[in-house]
């Protein structure tokens, strides 16, 4: 199993389901930071301003929001720099998708040296979000903070639960977009002024 989700799509009885964390299970006593995936904004029809989504996340109970797109921009820049190095093996394979990395590890280990040795955007976002929260709120310790990735991808949930390259993930929870969407849409409608 590489956590690709194909079995979920193919099961004629719809007996298989992706396992995400539930929003309700996130510890309310902790400082909760939402990490919306860049694709999250595409779920909202006629969204003119992403600030409605960002404010909505705060309104449903998150203490802060850190956009994964910020981390993706940094990873993109480091990837450009990495690609300029002389002794890299081609083809170069991005490490952002846990399904691709797991497939290579299990079935094509001879390609492992081609995977870019770089932290995926969700890991960098989780790390940066925690560091920024502790800088803003010096009373917080790392364990006082819950990093919650809002994801379209069931593989990311497995990836976070199983750790990043054998290490604990910087992300604590992975909540499905659909779980957050319905909570958020009601709050966003209230925030829109006629």
Annotated model-derived regions:
Residues 2-22:
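Iron-sulfur cluster-binding cysteine motifs and their immediate structural context
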Residues 19-194:
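Iron-sulfur-associated redox domains of electron-transfer enzymes in respiratory
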């Amino acid at each position: 199993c590489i956590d690709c989700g194909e079995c979920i799509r193919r099961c004629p009885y719809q007996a298989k389901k992706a396992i995400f964390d539930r929003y309700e299970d996130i510890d309310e006593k902790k400082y909760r930071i939402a990490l919306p995936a860049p694709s999250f904004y595409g779920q909202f029809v006629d969204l003119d301003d992403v600030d409605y989504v960002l404010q909505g996340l705060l309104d449903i109970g998150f203490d802060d929001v850190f956009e994964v797109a910020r981390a993706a921009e940094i990873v993109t820049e480091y990837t450009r720099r990495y690609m300029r190095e002389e002794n890299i093996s081609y083809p170069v394979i991005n490490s952002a998708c846990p399904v691709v990395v797991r497939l290579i590890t299990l079935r094509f280990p001879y390609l492992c040296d081609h995977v870019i040795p770089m932290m995926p955007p969700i890991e960098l976002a989780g790390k940066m979000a925690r560091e920024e929260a502790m800088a803003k709120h010096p009373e917080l310790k790392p364990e006082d903070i819950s990093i919650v990735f809002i994801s379209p991808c069931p593989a990311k949930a497995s990836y976070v639960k199983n750790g990043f390259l054998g290490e604990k993930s910087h992300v604590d929870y992975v909540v499905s977009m659909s779980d957050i969407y319905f909570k958020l849409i009601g709050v966003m409608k209230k925030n829109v002024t006629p």
